[in-house]
Amino acid sequence: MGQRHILHCDCNCFYASVEMQEHPELRGKSIAVCGDPEARHGIVLTASYPAKRMGVKTGMPIWEAKQHCRDLIIVPASYGKYQKYSGYVREVFNDYTDQVESFGLDEAWLDITGSVGLFGSPVKIAKEISARIKRELGITVSIGVSFNKITAKLGSDYKKPDGITIIEPENYKEIVYPLPAGDLLYVGAATQRKLGSYGISTIGQLAETNSETLKGWFGVMGYTLSAFARGLDQTPVAKQNAHTAIKSVGNSATTPRDLTTDEDVWLMLVLLSESVAMRMRDLGSKCNVVEIYVRDNELSGFTRRRKLDNPTNVSIEIARIAFDLFKRNYSWPKPLRGIGVRGADLCPADCAVQLGFFSNEEKREKLEHIDKAVDTLRQRYGYRSVQRAVVYTDPVLGGINAYDDHNIHPVGYFHTA
């Protein structure tokens, strides 16, 4: 098989760029697109480059961001608007290839191997895409041009904003080896710290470490890290359409106070699971995987996930699975500051269900009917018109409206372990 031609396109400061396009008076200013601006749990989802230069970062609580940048303009997130622009960007991609794999709303891989005969070299195609998105939508993109998905993403991260980086087998070591190990896809903060404890700080050092040694440190994931660091990745670009592009629905929050007990965590997981389940029902979807994200008060975090026997969009079922994942993986070494829930591997709500001798599908159907009735009441009378009793056990935590606050995070926000 010949060399593939893969692009990774990353819309720069996407949410902020969309807001500046819709509101020209914001251009050139320090802005942060955030969750609920009125509460401490509101966080920065995306910041403009002027704000970033002042130290404002994704995932930072609003109050902390304002300490870094006194003139920071807070803009509430508008998810529907970002979905619309994401669709516009995808239309440009589709003019060059039908092999487009979304990675969140603001990133995508394109396999243009079969397109070079029609449109010219990979670099020419990248330049055309960049110019069109800037001209037609007013948004800049950074593009990595390479021979697989992992290295293409490294390329898009290399020059921001509005850059194009070419990584080929011939210049791979020169460009990639000096980069921090944390720049590699799926190397989050916890993995980077563990690598650092073994004296590995760059991708080059990781590539030169024996794969069996890495397996001893990280299990089978060690083999993957070794391959990725050496530029080895045969993962195909997953062909998608409008109905398959959304693969997961997640919601997380930086809490109004530290979480210190299982009861605190259960309350938060109920709130977040309700939001995730409602959004899946809005999409006509169910999830086959439940994932949790946990971050302590020193900002160290991890994710854990569980594959389900049957897909679900039942709020309380997702909450119970998430809580069991938490209990099995956290023993309270520190208080928690952030927590999240994600439903992944989505399928249509009417997808086939595997029945067994001990199936609880009848009970699940009853819970689905209850959830739908609650959805109807909340749509008519407001989100707080119907609440679970646990919400009233803590007015501070229970005051979070996870669904309307729409704490929507870029994909990378969950990749911490």
Model feature map: region roles:
Residues 108-114, 303-306, 353-359:
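Short, hydrophobic beta-strand segments
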Residues 323-380:
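C-terminal hydrophobic structural anchor segments
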Residues 1-227, 233, 237-240, 278, ...:
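Gly/Gly-Pro- and Ser/Thr-rich, intrinsically disordered tail segments characteristic of DNA damage-repair
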Residues 14, 37-40, 297-300, 346-349:
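Short, charged/polar surface micro-motifs in flexible loops or helix N-caps
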Residues 73-74, 300-304, 351-352:
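Short small-residue beta-strand/loop micro-motif enriched in glycine and branched aliphatics
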Residues 8, 183, 191-336, 411:
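DNA-contacting surface of Y-family translesion DNA polymerases
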Residues 103-107, 146-149, 285-289, 334-338:
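Short Gly/Ser/Thr- and Asp/Glu-enriched loop/turn motifs at secondary-structure junctions
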